[in-house]
């Protein structure tokens, strides 16, 4: 380690070496490359990546915390002015907390006493001292005034949004302090670092503004509610929404037949969390999901599973929201519950784009729908979520009174990976139908049959769910040429209403049509329409 009084600089053809103060704690498997200057009292946990390999220095101020999985990178061009009036790619002030999986990408400035929540991103932005950025937020191309609060899921990309952010409250600081905790680290400079994984906890960098303990410490530490659930509840309440819950046993969960729990009338955070705890206890051994409810429009703005029968909860709530308001309680145009797109469609589009797929649409009038003669809509070239959702809204408006289905497209293989009906002229598309329509997932074999002919759990579960809702099962086949033009050939509907009868019949179809595409069809016999399409075999 270099002398504490000097900072190494890059020589010809060689990156500068990081400077780490002897009083800093850096985990042995953290990755620190380039001209990174880490001050005294800084704690860098396992899996942190700090890479200053583009020629400009990074500064991490005293007593800051970087939790597991945090990433700090920079660009070759673009600088920020640090508190010492020098140019940096990334400046992180004193007592800053950067939590798990957060990304700070330079040029970026974080003032003293800032907090950045799980999986949030700060890029090309200045964040004023004392600001709190909650979970899964994006802050880009803006300057946030000191002491502002960025709610979970917010997308702050215009200065107008940044200027309207609310001020941080004492309970926000207390919650941030509670989340930071005291993660153990391994000090590189300690000879026994590789053997000793324990360190003495030190005070957290963010102090509560009130001596009174808050709801967070009472519930997150001892109850069933995770910190992400508590954060989401607080965010929803701050935006004026009500909190609700639903529960389902394993049988009802498979068919998405949720039952409402006792309504939560209170808007007091402490009382709401207490009632949520009671709900989880009352329905132990069942699935429970959290709801955010807009009482003005009488619609849901958020859904997330918060309990499973085995007592576990999802690692992250990030992929489950129905629609999350961003900024100062305002919803983005594409996620608005008053728009044409349902919450589940918005979520599915987000997931498909995250996997690198393109989005497409097809439409059909009632006559063409009966013969599955879909017509392609104008292609959506963008991969930006906001633009894609806006174009989907336009497509639904343009083809009002027709059937419209959403497509997920793998541009590399020029094949579809997802199909779902998102507009039905005869009424709203139910959540079960939207959820039951995937063609395939990111793993091509996840919705196929195994080599010995037995069905995968995904396909068997799909069949079970459709039969449980009273739907009939059919199949369609296509060779490679017909598949490219979506010219499927229908097979006779499968007789039988039991899983034991239908699954063997499907296996026979797959054997008979080896070397062809085969897709499963769920049919509503009462309405004489399709409710699900699922690709179960590829050549």
UniProtKB/Swiss-Prot annotation:
Pfam family, one: RuBisCO_small
Disulphide linkage map: 261-279, 377-395
GO biological process, one term: carbon fixation
Main location: other
MF terms in GO: structural constituent of carboxysome shell
Induction data: Carboxysome size and components vary with growth conditions. When grown in ambient air at medium light (50 uE meter(-2) second(-1)) there are 719 units (both forms are included in this measure) of this protein per carboxysome, the numbers decrease under low light and high CO(2), and increase under high light (at protein level).
Swiss-Prot/TrEMBL RbcS-like repeat 1, SSUL repeat ranges: 226-397
GO cellular component, one term: carboxysome
Residues in RbcS-like repeat 3, SSUL repeats: 453-539
Disruption phenotype: Single gene deletion does not form normal carboxysomes, and does not grow in normal air but in 2% CO(2), called a high-CO(2) requiring phenotype, HCR. CcmK2 and RuBisCO are targeted to an abnormal large polar body in some studies, RuBisCO is soluble in others. When ccmL-ccmM-ccmN-ccmO are deleted no carboxysomes form, cells are HCR and RuBisCO is soluble.
Post-translational modification: Identified as 2 proteins of 58 and 38 kDa by mass spectrometry, called M58 and M35, the shorter protein is translated starting at Val-216. Protease inhibitors do not alter the appearance of M35. In isolated carboxysomes M35 is 4-5 fold more abundant. The first amino acid (equivalent to Val-216) is not seen in Edman degradation, while Tyr-219 and Gln-222 may be post-translationally modified.
Low complexity bias (residue ranges): 431-457
Region (Carbonic anhydrase-like domain): 1-214
Compartments, record wording: Carboxysome
Keywords: Bacterial microcompartment, Carbon dioxide fixation, Carboxysome, Disulfide bond, Photosynthesis, Repeat
Uses in industry and biotechnology: Heterologous expression of 12 carboxysomal genes in E.coli (ccaA, ccmK2, ccmK3, ccmK4, ccmL, ccmM, ccmN, ccmO, ccmP, rbcL, rbcS, rbcX) leads to the formation of bodies that resemble carboxysomes, have densely packed paracrystalline arrays and RuBisCO activity. These structures open the door to generating carboxysomes in plant cells to increase their photosynthesis and productivity, as well as tailoring bacterial microcompartments to specific metabolic needs and molecule delivery.
SMART domains xref list: RuBisCO_small
InterPro entries on file: CA_gamma_LbH, CcmM, Gamma-CA, RuBisCO_ssu_dom, RuBisCO_ssu_sf, Trimer_LpxA-like_sf
Region span, Disordered: 194-213, 427-459
RbcS-like repeat 2, SSUL repeat segments: 341-425
Family statement: Belongs to the gamma-class carbonic anhydrase family.
Domain comment in the entry: In the N-terminus has a gamma-class carbonic anhydrase-like domain (CA), while the C-terminus has 3 repeats that are similar to the small subunit of RuBisCO (rbcS), called SSUL. The SSUL are connected by flexible linkers. The N-terminal domain forms a scaffold on which CA and maybe other carboxysomal proteins assemble, while the C-terminus binds RuBisCO. At least 2 SSUL domains are required for initiation of carboxysome assembly. Isolated reduced and oxidized CcmM35 binds holo-RuBisCO (RbcL(8)-RbcS(8)) but neither subunit octamer alone; RuBisCO has a higher affinity for reduced M35.
Note: The M35 form (short form) is translated from the internal start codon Val-216 (gtg), under control of an internal Shine-Dalgarno sequence. Silent mutation of the codon for Val-216 to a non-start codon (i.e. gtg to gtc) leads to low level expression of the M35 form, and abnormal carboxysomes which contain the expected proteins, but does not grow in normal air.
Role noted for this protein: Functions as a scaffold protein for the assembly of beta-carboxysomes, initiates carboxysome assembly by coalescing RuBisCO (ribulose bisphosphate carboxylase, rbcL-rbcS). Produced as a full-length (M58) and a shorter form (M35); both forms are required for correct carboxysome assembly and growth. The short form is more abundant. Despite its strong similarity to gamma-class carbonic anhydrase (CA) it does not have detectable CA activity.
Protein name (database record): Carboxysome assembly protein CcmM
Species this protein is from: Synechococcus elongatus (strain ATCC 33912 / PCC 7942 / FACHB-805) (Anacystis nidulans R2)
Name of the gene encoding the protein in the UniProt record: ccmM
